[in-house]
């Protein structure tokens, strides 16, 4: 029986690496075949030039970092007692400065969650808030909303200014992200080497996403603490001799897994990875020593789920099991295009009144799509989904952080017209990461020994397989970013060992990192030359592009104030033109200074207006003598027109998206702002 069980365990490992290695190889190829976010470079590089340039950049970056790390790591190891905390503190400081100096607004689902959590401070249930329909469809985000509500209630008790609440929750995000990071460091130090743990920290230090993603505040980033924490606590439990402490740690593991699952469903993959790993540690099928550990984990999970269930019952105001979309909806939606969100599928599922009808309809449509695709179509879909979820090095940061609560000079370099530098670096870095992860998997499969880090391999394998059947998005790899970085650190350590052996035979190789640094400078000089010849640069004075409407209609006369001391010559207004060229409305736009002087004037033609997009108006450059409050007036010049244009605004009545101005229609409407942007285009 023992021999049979050993054979089963070997088979599991064979299947694991037979899956994870080819999928990682394809993801690596995909990482070298995309320039998303680098608009100027996309216009210059085509076909095989893209992977050739990115492969070269990734190689140069890896060689340069290898040289730097070889010098730094021994010094940090000697002074690890204070150097490692100092390194972590440096990264945390950079994250905090990112939040405080680049004041972006939450957007999309993130904003809905935050706004609703703020509304719960005054309302009894989510059902009483503006976004109740959203949470009725997607109750999976209710835990995140209640989590945010807890922190906002604390902010209220501590008298933290309301205008700082978005930055406040992002600081909470930093805490949870760094808890996850610390757990990864401890696991690597324990099961690989302290050097590998320090490499992991240094690789995070030079990863811009580690700072950009603190602006996100969403389930993807917060779940890092729960998934990584569960792995670390599980490991500590297995190494503890005290039975009482051991079961307490397993109990805590269950709490972390259940709480993390409620925050982000992908934590279930971590739970599955730990379960499989625990099964692989059983010496024989008759060995029941692990039963107590399993029961402790289950007890912790049941307790956490029970507590959340009571909280949901208190604050939801509806039955999520009846109103929520069925699980099969996300599977069905993923079997089209590249597997991403599709508004038509959302509307299709929402058109049915009961959950049973929605489930039956989604299952039927899923069957139809699978039948139409056939084996070849499914293979293409799976390849595309892997690339969307794991090959993109930007994690869609450019769109996630577009709305600026305060204008920042770095905005154009982060996600504006000079964003090629950052996007190109991220793609090069991601190519390096994917290559080193593949190397680590190959080494483990053919030359490595079984160890606790196999949990990481199992987790990433589960992530790959999960997104073959689930809806995907560019940002959906974020819950696994620390696991990828752990494997990247292992891969970097393997490369360094090989480099040291080569250097013993060829001393001139020691100059390779310096040559790589020179090569990187040349590459980015080329990127700079291309970028400066690209699209015009926008210097924003105001950027508030989020919209959600209530019963207010902005179709005739209204105004919006804004404050700036920067020059501007363009205004973007987000509008909805439902009738296209048949829209016969005409509006006059005027921008008034504080003394009532007309600073700019333009015309808005309804027939030329887009639908749910920005209408751009240009005029002569306005140069303020000093910072002042301007008034943007919109007036319908032909009131007898048959069709009017809808001007969009953000108006839940809870959160003020633009604190330096107000909307008047004709009286001031509190906490409501036009969806608009004011900028100078150079």
Stretch-by-stretch model annotation:
Residues 67, 168-191, 229, 436-442:
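Transmembrane-helix motifs of polytopic, lipid-linked glycan transferases
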Residues 43-56, 168, 384-460:
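Membrane-interface anchor segments at the N-terminal boundary of transmembrane helices
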Residues 138, 142, 157-182, 423-428:
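Loop-to-helix entry region of an early transmembrane alpha helix in multi-pass inner-membrane enzymes
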Residues 169-176, 199-234, 263-270, 476-481:
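Multi-pass, polyprenyl lipid-linked donor-dependent membrane glycosyltransferases
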Residues 179, 184-206, 244, 449-458:
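Transmembrane-helix signature of polytopic, membrane-embedded enzymes
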Residues 116-118, 133-161:
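Short hydrophobic/aromatic helix or loop-helix immediately within or flanking a transmembrane segment
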Residues 1-97, 287-299, 512-515:
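Start-transfer (signal-anchor) and selected internal transmembrane alpha helices
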Residues 123-128, 312-405:
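Membrane-proximal stem/loop segments at transmembrane-domain junctions that anchor or position
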């Amino acid at each position: 029986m023992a021999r049979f069980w050993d054979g089963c365990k070997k088979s599991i490992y064979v299947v694991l690496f037979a899956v994870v290695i080819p999928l990682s190889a394809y993801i690596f190829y995909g990482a070298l075949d995309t320039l998303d976010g680098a608009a100027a470079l996309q216009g210059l590089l085509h076909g095989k030039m893209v992977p050739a340039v990115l492969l070269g950049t990734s190689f140069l970056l890896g060689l340069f970092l290898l040289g730097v790390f070889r010098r730094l790591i021994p010094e940090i190891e000697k002074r690890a007692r204070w150097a490692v905390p100092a390194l972590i503190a440096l990264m945390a400081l950079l994250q905090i400065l990112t939040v405080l100096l680049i004041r972006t607004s939450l957007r999309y689902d993130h904003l809905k969650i935050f706004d609703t959590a703020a509304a719960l401070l005054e309302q009894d249930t989510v059902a009483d808030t503006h976004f109740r329909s959203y949470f009725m469809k997607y109750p999976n985000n209710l835990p995140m909303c209640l989590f945010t509500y807890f922190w906002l209630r604390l902010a209220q008790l501590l008298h933290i200014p309301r205008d700082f609440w978005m930055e406040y929750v992002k600081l909470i995000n930093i805490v949870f992200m760094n808890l996850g990071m610390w757990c990864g460091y401890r696991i690597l130090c324990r099961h690989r080497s302290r050097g590998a743990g320090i490499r992991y920290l240094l690789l995070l230090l030079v990863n811009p996403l580690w700072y950009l993603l603190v602006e996100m505040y969403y389930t993807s980033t917060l779940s890092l603490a729960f998934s990584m924490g569960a792995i670390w606590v599980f490991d500590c439990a297995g190494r503890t001799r005290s039975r009482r402490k051991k079961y307490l740690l397993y109990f805590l593991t269950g709490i972390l897994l259940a709480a993390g699952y409620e925050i982000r469903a992908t934590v279930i993959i971590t739970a599955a990875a730990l379960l499989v790993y625990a099964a692989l540690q059983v010496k024989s099928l008759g060995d029941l020593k692990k039963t107590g550990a399993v029961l402790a984990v289950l007890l912790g999970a049941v307790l956490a789920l029970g507590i959340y269930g009571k909280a949901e019952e208190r604050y939801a105001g509806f039955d999520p099991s009846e109103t929520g979309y069925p699980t099969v909806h996300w599977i069905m939606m993923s079997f089209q295009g590249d597997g991403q969100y599709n508004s038509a599928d959302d509307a299709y599922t929402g058109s049915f009144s009961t959950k049973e009808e929605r489930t039956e309809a989604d299952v039927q449509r899923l069957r139809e799509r699978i039948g139409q695709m056939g084996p070849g179509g499914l293979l293409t879909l799976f390849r595309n989904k892997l690339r969307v979820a794991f090959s993109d090095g930007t994690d869609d940061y450019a769109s996630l952080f577009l709305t600026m609560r305060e204008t920042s000079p770095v905005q154009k370099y982060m996600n504006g017209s000079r964003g090629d530098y950052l996007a190109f670096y991220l793609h090069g870095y991601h190519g390096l990461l994917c290559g080193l992860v593949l190397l680590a998997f190959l080494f483990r499969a053919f030359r490595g020994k079984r160890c606790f880090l196999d949990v990481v391999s199992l987790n990433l394998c589960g992530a790959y397989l999960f997104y073959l059947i689930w809806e995907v998005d560019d940002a959906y790899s974020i819950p696994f970013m620390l696991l990828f970085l752990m494997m990247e650190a292992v891969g970097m350590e393997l490369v360094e060992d090989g480099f040291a052996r080569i250097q013993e035979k060829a001393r001139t190789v020691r100059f390779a990192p310096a040559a790589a640094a020179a090569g990187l400078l040349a590459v980015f000089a080329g990127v700079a030359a291309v970028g400066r010849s690209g699209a015009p640069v926008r210097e924003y004075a105001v950027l508030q592009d989020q919209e959600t409407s209530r019963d207010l209609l902005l179709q005739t006369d209204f105004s919006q104030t804004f404050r700036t001391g920067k020059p501007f010559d363009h205004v973007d207004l987000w509008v909805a033109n439902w009738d296209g060229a048949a829209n016969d409305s005409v509006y006059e736009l005027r921008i008034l200074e504080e003394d009532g002087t007309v600073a700019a004037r333009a015309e808005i033609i309804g027939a030329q207006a887009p639908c749910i997009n920005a209408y751009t108006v240009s005029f002569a450059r306005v140069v303020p003598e000093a910072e002042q409050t301007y008034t943007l007036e919109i007036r319908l010049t032909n009131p007898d027109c048959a069709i009017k244009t809808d001007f969009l605004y953000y108006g839940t009545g809870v959160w003020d998206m633009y604190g330096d101005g107000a909307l008047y229609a004709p009286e001031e409407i509190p906490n409501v702002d036009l969806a608009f942007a004011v900028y100078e285009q150079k």
